[in-house]
């Protein structure tokens, strides 16, 4: 005991010593346990990472709960905090008593806060009111609750409101309650921070205590305040200047509190810039204070530790204060660069010794309490030396990133200061070290400081920071900023390998056992450092990939089973957002990891390839310098992946990909892409792009394709394919970012374009085997794998995605690149026979649209990308057509030209040898070589008298019309048509010969050159000259082409042959003549493969197909009807003639038509059933248009109505309200409910017996039994097409179902085939012949599932079949609204031949069409027309048209007149000769004069606007251009319909 202590305090001191000894004994055991537990945490990690996910939190919680007991003066507060924590931790165990106590305590605290604020509101308006007790009480409440909150070990870098970070904490709730008191907050931030507050109240009292409490309370509630809003309002009234003065020179703890407020204010960049001058003056002073506080703390701590067992607490305090006195007269440690900072000149009103005495007095009390257990934070009250240092560090941290303060850091030796704080850290108290590390991280963003830090051994000091501890979070920030500086990382990578190994081990430890913010920093550290090979190798050596993968494998947002636990209160929007950020960082790190491995692997491959090359390459450089960073552009990466794919075995293994697959990383990445559809955050594009880039690199190993084809479990328990997610990203469904689209296309290209036959050379990346048997097995496996990839891509609508991307025009800067990549993917996909067959029928190829795209780039600056698009477009055309692509004119490679070139190339050219000899003979005679000519005549047996040579103009026909003024057709003219056939001809040989210019026309013995074609003179070919040099190509067969190629882009050079070089075959007369005849053959409009012998004297021309007499334009209806008796089938022309004419017959309207809107209709015998917008079903008699009866069927619009053939059952459907479909029976003139189908949006009857109903619910089809109402079968596709307007339908025999583009077998319930999707709306219908399916514009063959043809006129049109073998196509209702901008004929319907889908007519009704129905025998059609306008009231009614009836003159005159008012019964009764309609049209009159006579008005009368064909009456849309000819004879329409019905 010290002798200076008074006798009155002896007993108290002795009691205090005994209590402290007892406390030390109790806490020493806990300290040992903590140390032992910390030692265990440093052991190697377990293999199962998910079990380690929350180790740090559990350990910290255990230390918090068992850390020790507080001093006697804080027993109440600490006990309350511990009781709340225990109650919250044990709530799951069902401790009702603890829960009740905690709830009572929270309620009491809330009540206490409310009472204090209410009391303040009542008294604060009184004169002389003292707010100090109120502020003190509030500060104590918030300090107590903040202590409880901090003991839960929240993330120190989490800047969210405490209530959002932990909704169960009382601290956050109290903050919300306080901030609702705007009056109090205004007083606190404005008035209570004034030095003259009491003097303004006419009270003679110092405001120092009030200012201290105000600063203290503001700092305690700062986590719930918006810093920018608070200090920007305080900037104008001088509050910040006052705080600067307090921070610079004031008494403690006001000086420290003011520094803390400045630290928060400097986080706002605008404030930091505005107060730049004050900061420049204050920063050196703060650094000096830190030097002094550090020196005093270390010295005092050393003395206390050495004399702890010999000296009392008072003597320790005396020793500490003596150090303060000495330090106050001493200067701070000087920097080698600068001696003194000039701060000593300013005098202080409050001496440093007195200030620090207060701080260290409080530090002694805090140290005696907390030296045996882990300290979670540094309290603000009472203010200690650690509190002051913490707040100064925060102030310096907020300014550390500014360049102007970097010089001050060097001048004041900040690095030595930081090193002093980080040396010999105590595991139980690293709170101050955490603040120091944050300050260090702010300085490490400067390259100069980072390099200095590394050179002075800073990295070694960082790695000595104990873990687990709060300072570990600071280390994660520091190493991230170090990795951000590449020069610093290069120096680190050149250090000793054990140090690098320890760095990687430390970062991996952070990945597994720290807060989320620390994990993010560690992940970003790895993503920046993977480019250095030494880090990459060490990462793999320590199983880093598994630990990195485990960071996201335990996240709830990626776990489909998480949806089962909807009551998980820990999972909220903030947690979900934080998890998405974590996924983003991990995906970026995985991308950098795989790209770095790929870079070094590719350079290793280059080293093997160029091993024999003496010249140094970049590959040698990188392999000899493993610390050099590896960087690749997007295009370089894709090209190198393609190269490695060609040299990698089909069964190859690669350690990074193998490990990622073993961990399930490929599936996880696909799940991330699929789940990101529903994510709405700024980093979604980067997340998806990074995941796709990882998959792109992994595609080097073909086994990855299997994972992409497998099914994934989604959050809604549905399944999808990996390729479905990739295709969705390529289509822009996830993000419209061009980089995401290109990354997705890269994955598709690497998969569908993967080589089947891979190079098995010595430069292969990895060789699986060399035996012939293994090669065959590998080849078979490769084919099966690639075919599986093709099938998966097609099943997920890959064709339509790639086709749409090939025609994209935006974003304009990347459109050319996207088109090129999409074209390459489709070209690779076209290696599949199925895809090739489908693509060949699409308009993009069949109509020449691709050639249009190939002409010009979208952006002229992107011509390089456009050239790539042209390259793959030609490759695609070659594969689709099966023909060789022409080389001379690559911009016009239409399928027809390629087909023609292939026909010409396959033609065998034969000619008469005697004619050739005769030409040679004449040539020799004309050149004076008579003896040679006579010798030739004798040897070949030519006749003695030379026949007269026939000139071309004597030909019975001209095969090529010459332009006016042209005297001859030169050989170049002949060649002009060969541009499309050169490649096909040249493709059969390995020689590409060329020779000189064409010779002049022949002389007297030649043909007449006046009007015909001049034959080249071959005498200029001297066979004794040096042979022409010919370059060999890769072709295997012999070519007949000797056409000149020297001036063509792809031509071969011409030169003299050298000795010992190539030995080409000589050009012969036969090849010259053969090419000449081939050129003639290429001019034919319809070339054929098998040709007769060519005549050298006459130009060749293949015969044109002769038009059939039946199809002649002069073959009219009368003669055609007569030829029918002779056995000719003329029904097609009759059908086209009849369905060219439509005449309105009757309009059906209700009596209250102004209030009713018709939506749909169905013709049933002599009645017509109509659905309305009001949900009614109404029945009208077609004879008189009178409404028979009606019933309310739905609460909303009736979208579809259909009656069975018997007319006693009606099914109605409404899309918007439940029940959506109802089956009604019609009896006694009323609708009677028979069956409700609540979830079925569309329904139709079966075709044969009509005892079943087929309902549609989204992509699912369900079959119901009408009699029992039970469900017979359900058909849900595995991979749905998701048509927006799917309507399931049955075939004519009820054996097949088509729903959502999937064909089903009704009896077995199995999927038969999934048709490719080429539109978003219409799923398709069966053709009545049961052999074809029409899905929008595509016609599919049910026997082979081939695409037969496309019918563009049916685009977005519903098909209705007539018994007369025609198809009516119309855009109905919602379909019209869906594509209003793209639909061509919204007010018309098309009539097509059901046999060949040729267009018969397009009938414009000049009004929108809501529905269309056909009668049982096809003689009538009913159209629901919408007569609504922009300014007129909407009016709809049903107009019935008579098929085959020509419009009268009256109807043409009234075509544009207003719609007349209806009669009293609400219908148009027509003329006196209106006919009654029975089941078989027995009362239908004979329309004898269809040409339009004067009594047309007596035969057929209409009162409304009528339909008008877009085509003329006498010219239909026949493809052959024929005229149906109705000038002679009569045509009985009734007989025609009766005959057709009997044929059916």
Swiss-Prot record:
Family matches, as SMART domains: LisH
Q: Where is the LisH domain?
A: 912-944
List compositional bias (Low complexity) regions by residue number. Answer: 10-35, 961-971
Q: Which UniProt keywords apply?
A: Nucleus, Phosphoprotein, Ubl conjugation pathway
GO cellular component terms, A-Z: Cul4-RING E3 ubiquitin ligase complex; nucleus
Q: Residue ranges under compositional bias (Polar residues)?
A: 1016-1027
Q: Localized where?
A: Nucleus
The Phosphoserine modification is found at 565, 569, 955
Recorded metabolic or biological pathway in which this protein acts: Protein modification; protein ubiquitination
Quaternary structure (record): Component of the CUL4-RBX1-DDB1-DCAF1 E3 ubiquitin-protein ligase complex. Interacts with l(2)gl.
Family recorded in the similarity comment = Belongs to the VPRBP/DCAF1 family.
Notes on the domains: The DWD boxes are required for interaction with DDB1.
Q: What does this protein do?
A: Probable substrate recognition component of tsome E3 ubiquitin-protein ligase complex. Plays a key role in cell competition via its interaction with l(2)gl.
Q: What is this protein called?
A: Protein mahjong
What lineage does UniProt assign to this protein's organism?
Eukaryota, Metazoa, Ecdysozoa, Arthropoda, Hexapoda
């Amino acid at each position: 005991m010290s002798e200076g202590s008074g006798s009155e305090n002896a007993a108290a001191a002795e009691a205090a010593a005994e209590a402290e000894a007892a406390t030390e004994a109790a806490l020493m055991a806990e300290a040992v346990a903590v140390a032992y537990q910390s030692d265990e945490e440093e052991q190697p990690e377990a293999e199962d990472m998910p079990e380690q996910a929350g180790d740090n939190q559990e350990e910290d919680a255990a230390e918090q709960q068992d850390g020790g007991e507080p001093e006697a003066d804080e027993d109440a507060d600490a006990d309350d905090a511990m009781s709340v924590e225990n109650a919250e931790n044990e709530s799951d165990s069902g401790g009702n008593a603890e829960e009740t106590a905690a709830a009572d305590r929270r309620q009491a605290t809330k009540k206490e806060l409310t009472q204090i604020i209410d009391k303040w509101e009542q008294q604060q308006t009184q004169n002389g009111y003292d707010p100090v007790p109120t502020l003190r009480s509030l500060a104590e409440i918030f300090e107590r609750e903040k202590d409880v909150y901090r003991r839960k070990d929240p993330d120190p870098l989490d800047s969210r409101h405490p209530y959002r970070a932990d909704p169960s904490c009382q601290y956050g709730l109290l903050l919300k309650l306080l901030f609702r008191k705007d009056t109090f907050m205004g007083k606190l931030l404005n008035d209570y921070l004034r030095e003259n507050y009491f003097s303004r109240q006419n009270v003679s009292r110092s405001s120092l205590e009030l200012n201290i409490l105000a600063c203290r309370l503001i700092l305690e509630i700062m986590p719930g305040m918006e810093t920018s809003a608070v200090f920007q309002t305080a900037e104008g009234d001088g509050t910040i200047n006052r705080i600067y003065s307090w921070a610079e020179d004031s008494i403690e703890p006001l000086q420290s509190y003011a520094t803390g407020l400045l630290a928060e204010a400097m986080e706002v960049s605008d404030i930091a810039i505005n107060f730049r001058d004050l900061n420049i003056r204050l920063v050196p002073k703060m650094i000096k204070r830190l030097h002094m506080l550090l020196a005093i703390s270390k010295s005092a701590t050393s003395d206390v530790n050495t004399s702890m067992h010999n000296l009392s607490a008072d003597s320790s305090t005396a020793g500490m204060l003596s150090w303060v006195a000495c330090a106050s007269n001493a200067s701070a440690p000087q920097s080698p660069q600068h001696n003194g900072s000039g701060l000593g000149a300013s005098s202080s009103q409050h001496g440093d010794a007195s200030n620090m005495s207060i701080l260290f007095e409080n530090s002694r009390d805090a140290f005696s309490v907390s030296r045996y257990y882990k300290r979670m934070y540094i309290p603000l009250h009472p203010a200690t030396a650690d509190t002051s240092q913490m707040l100064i560090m925060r102030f310096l941290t907020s300014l550390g990133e500014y360049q102007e303060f970097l010089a001050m850091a060097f001048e004041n030796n900040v690095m030595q200061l930081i090193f002093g704080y980080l040396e010999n850290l105590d595991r139980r108290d690293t709170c101050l070290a955490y603040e120091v590390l944050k300050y260090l991280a702010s300085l490490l963003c400067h390259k100069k400081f980072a390099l200095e830090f590394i050179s002075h051994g800073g990295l070694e000091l960082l790695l000595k920071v104990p873990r687990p501890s709060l300072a570990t979070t600071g280390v994660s920030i520091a190493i991230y900023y170090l990795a951000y500086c590449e020069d610093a990382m290069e120096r680190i990578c050149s250090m000793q390998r054990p140090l690098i190994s320890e760095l990687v081990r430390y970062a991996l430890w952070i990945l597994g056992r720290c807060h989320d913010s620390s994990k993010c920093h560690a992940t970003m550290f790895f993503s920046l450092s993977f480019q250095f090979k030494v880090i990459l190798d060490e990462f793999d050596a320590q199983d880093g990939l598994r630990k990195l993968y485990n960071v996201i494998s335990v996240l709830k947002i990626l776990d489909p089973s998480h949806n089962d636990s909807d009551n998980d209160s820990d999972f909220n929007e903030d947690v979900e957002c934080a998890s998405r950020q974590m996924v983003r960082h991990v995906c970026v790190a995985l991308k950098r990891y795989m790209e770095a491995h790929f870079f070094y692997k590719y350079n290793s491959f280059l080293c093997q390839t160029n091993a024999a090359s003496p010249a140094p390459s970049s590959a040698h450089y990188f392999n000899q310098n493993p610390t050099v960073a590896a960087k690749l552009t997007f295009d370089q990466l894709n090209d190198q992946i393609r190269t490695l794919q060609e040299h990698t075995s089909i069964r190859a293994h690669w350690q990074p990909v193998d490990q990622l697959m073993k961990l399930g990383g490929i599936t996880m990445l696909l799940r991330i892409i699929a789940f990101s559809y529903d994510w709405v955050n700024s980093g979604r594009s980067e997340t998806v792009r990074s995941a796709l880039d990882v998959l792109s690199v992994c595609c080097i190993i073909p086994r990855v394709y299997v994972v992409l084809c497998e099914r994934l479990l989604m959050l809604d328990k549905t399944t999808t394919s990996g390729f479905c997610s990739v295709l969705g990203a390529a289509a822009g469904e996830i993000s419209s970012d061009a980089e995401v689209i290109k990354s997705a296309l890269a994955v598709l290209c690497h998969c569908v374009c993967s080589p089947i036959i891979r190079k098995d050379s010595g430069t292969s990346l990895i060789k699986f085997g060399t035996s012939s048997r293994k090669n065959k097995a590998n080849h078979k496996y490769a084919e099966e794998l690639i075919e599986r990839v093709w099938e998966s891509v097609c099943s997920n609508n890959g064709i339509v995605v790639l086709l749409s991307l090939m025609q994209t025009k935006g974003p304009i800067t990347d459109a050319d690149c996207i088109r090129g990549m999409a074209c390459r993917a489709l070209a690779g996909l076209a290696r599949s026979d199925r895809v090739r067959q489908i693509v060949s029928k699409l308009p993009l190829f069949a109509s020449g649209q691709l050639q249009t795209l190939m002409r010009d780039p979208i952006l002229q600056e992107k011509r390089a990308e456009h050239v790539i698009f042209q390259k793959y477009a030609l490759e695609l055309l070659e594969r689709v057509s099966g023909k060789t692509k022409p080389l001379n004119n690559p911009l016009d490679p239409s399928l027809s030209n390629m087909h023609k070139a292939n026909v010409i190339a396959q033609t065998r050219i034969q000619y008469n040898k005697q004619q050739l000899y005769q030409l040679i003979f004449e040539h020799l005679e004309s050149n004076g070589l008579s003896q040679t000519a006579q010798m030739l005549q004798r040897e070949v047996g030519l006749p003695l008298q030379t026949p007269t040579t026939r000139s071309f103009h004597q030909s019975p026909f001209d095969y090529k019309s010459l332009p006016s003024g042209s005297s001859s057709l030169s050989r170049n003219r002949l060649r002009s048509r060969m541009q499309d056939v050169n490649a096909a001809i040249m493709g059969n040989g390995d020689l590409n010969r060329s020779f000189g210019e064409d010779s002049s026309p022949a002389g007297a013995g030649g043909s007449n050159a006046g009007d015909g074609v001049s034959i080249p003179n071959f005498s200029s070919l001297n066979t004794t000259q040096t042979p022409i040099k010919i370059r060999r190509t890769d072709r295997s067969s012999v070519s007949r082409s000797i056409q000149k190629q020297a001036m063509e882009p792809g031509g071969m050079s011409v030169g003299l042959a050298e000795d010992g070089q190539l030995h080409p075959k000589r050009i012969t007369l036969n090849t010259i003549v053969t090419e000449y005849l081939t050129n003639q053959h290429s001019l034919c409009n319809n070339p054929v493969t098998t040709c007769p012998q060519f005549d050298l004297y006459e130009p060749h021309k293949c015969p044109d197909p002769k038009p059939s007499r039946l199809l002649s334009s002069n073959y009219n209806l009368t003669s055609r009807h007569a030829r029918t008796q002779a056995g000719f089938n003329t029904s097609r022309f009759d059908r086209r003639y009849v369905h060219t004419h439509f005449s309105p017959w009757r309009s059906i309207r209700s009596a209250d038509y102004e209030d009713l809107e018709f939506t749909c209709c169905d013709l049933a015998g002599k009645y017509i059933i109509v659905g309305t917008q009001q949900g009614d079903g109404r029945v009208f008699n077609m004879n008189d248009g009178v409404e028979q009866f009606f019933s309310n069927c739905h609460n909303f619009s009736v979208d579809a109505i259909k009656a069975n053939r018997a007319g006693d059952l009606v099914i109605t459907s409404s899309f918007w309200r439940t029940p959506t479909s109802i089956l009604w029976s019609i009896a006694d003139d009323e609708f009677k409910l028979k069956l409700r189908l609540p979830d079925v949006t569309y329904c139709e009857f079966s075709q044969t017996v009509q005892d079943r109903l087929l309902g549609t619910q989204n992509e699912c089809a369900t079959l119901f039994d009408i009699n029992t109402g039970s469900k017979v079968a359900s058909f849900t596709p595995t991979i749905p097409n998701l048509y927006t307007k799917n309507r399931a339908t049955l075939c004519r025999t009820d054996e097949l179902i088509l729903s959502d583009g999937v064909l089903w077998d009704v009896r077995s319930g199995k999927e038969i085939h999934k048709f490719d999707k080429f539109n978003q709306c219409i799923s398709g219908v069966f053709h009545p012949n049961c052999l074809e399916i029409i899905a929008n514009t595509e016609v599919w063959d049910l026997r082979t599932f081939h695409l037969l043809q496309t019918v563009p006129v049916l685009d977005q049109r519903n098909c209705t079949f007539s018994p007369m073998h025609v198809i009516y196509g119309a855009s109905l209702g919602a379909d019209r609204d869906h594509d209003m901008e793209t639909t061509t004929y919204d007010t018309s319907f098309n009539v097509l031949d059901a046999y060949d889908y040729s267009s018969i007519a397009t009938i414009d009704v000049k009004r929108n069409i809501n529905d269309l129905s056909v009668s049982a025998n096809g003689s009538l059609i009913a159209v629901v027309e919408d007569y609504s306008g922009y300014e007129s009231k909407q009016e709809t009614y049903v107009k019935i048209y008579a098929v085959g009836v020509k419009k009268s003159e009256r109807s043409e005159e009234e075509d544009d007149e207003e719609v007349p008012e209806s009669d009293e019964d609400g219908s148009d009764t027509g003329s006196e000769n209106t006919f009654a309609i029975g089941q078989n049209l027995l009362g239908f009159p004979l329309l004898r004069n269809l040409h339009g006579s004067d009594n047309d008005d007596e035969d057929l009368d209409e009162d409304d606007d009528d339909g008008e064909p877009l085509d003329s009456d006498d010219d239909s849309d026949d493809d052959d251009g024929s005229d149906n000819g109705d000038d002679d004879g009569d045509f009985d329409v009734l007989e025609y319909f009766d005959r057709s019905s009997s044929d059916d």
